[in-house]
Amino acid sequence: MSSTPLLPVLLSTMILLSAVSTTTTALTQDFCVANLPLGADTPSGYQCRPAATVTAADFYSGALARPGILIRPFNTSLASAFVQQYPAVNGLGISASRVDILPGGVVPLHTHPAGSELLYVLDGALVAGFISSSDNKVYYKEVSKGGMFVFPQGLLHFQYNTGDTTAVAFAAYSSSNPGLQILDYALFANNLPTSYVVKGTFLAEAEVRRLKSKFGGSG
C-alpha cells in the first residue's frame, strides 16, 4: 500500500485554511459601519461603531446625487462615496464615485493604489484609457452612454471629454478606500526642489516653477 508524504499534505492544508480564513474574515459579522472619529484607516478598515447605534439611515448616502466640487484646472467635478464619506461601506470591499466632465475637460492621469475601477457612462461620451506597467502600452477607447470601461488596480488612467456636452459617469471600486493619487499634484504640489523635478522630467525650470505655482507646490 502506497503512503502519501505527510509534509506536502500538511502544507497544502495550512495554505487552504489560511485562504479560507482570509476570505471569511469579513463574514464574521453582518456589517461594520466605520467609527471615523476613533482613528485612521488600517489594512483591515476602520473600527466598527457599536451595532446598537446603527440605523437604516447609516446605509443610505446621497453623496453622488449631484455633481461634486469643480476642479478648475481640469474642468471636472468629482464626488466620492469612499469610506470617509460613506462609513457603511467599511469592510465591504466596495465604494463609488461620480465624475462630471465639461466639454474639453479631463480627469488627468491618476491611480487608485488599493482598488480596481469599473466606469459606467451615464450621459454623454468620453475617452477612457490606462497605461500598462509592463511595457507602457496605452489602452484607450471612446465610451458612449451606457458603456463601461475597467481600470486595473494601481495603473495610471484617465478620462477625456472630446464632445460638446457634459459627460457624466459613475465608478465602482473593489475597495472601500481605493485611494487617489493624481500625477500632476504628485509632481508639482510638493516641496521637492525644482532642480530635482527638472532632472526627473526634462521640463524647463521655468515650466516646472509655473506648474508648481499652479498646483500649490514649493521648492
Swiss-Prot record:
Superkingdom: Eukaryota
Residues the entry annotates as binding Mn(2+): H110, H112, E117, H157
Disulfide bridge map: C32-C48
Glycosylation sites per record: N75
Location(s) in or outside the cell: Secreted, Extracellular space, Apoplast
UniProt keyword annotations, A-Z: Apoplast, Disulfide bond, Glycoprotein, Manganese, Metal-binding, Secreted, Signal
Major localization listed first in the record, in broad terms: secreted
Pfam families in the record: Cupin_1
Protein family per UniProt: Belongs to the germin family.
Name of the protein this chain belongs to: Germin-like protein 8-13
Species, as recorded: Oryza sativa subsp. japonica (Rice)
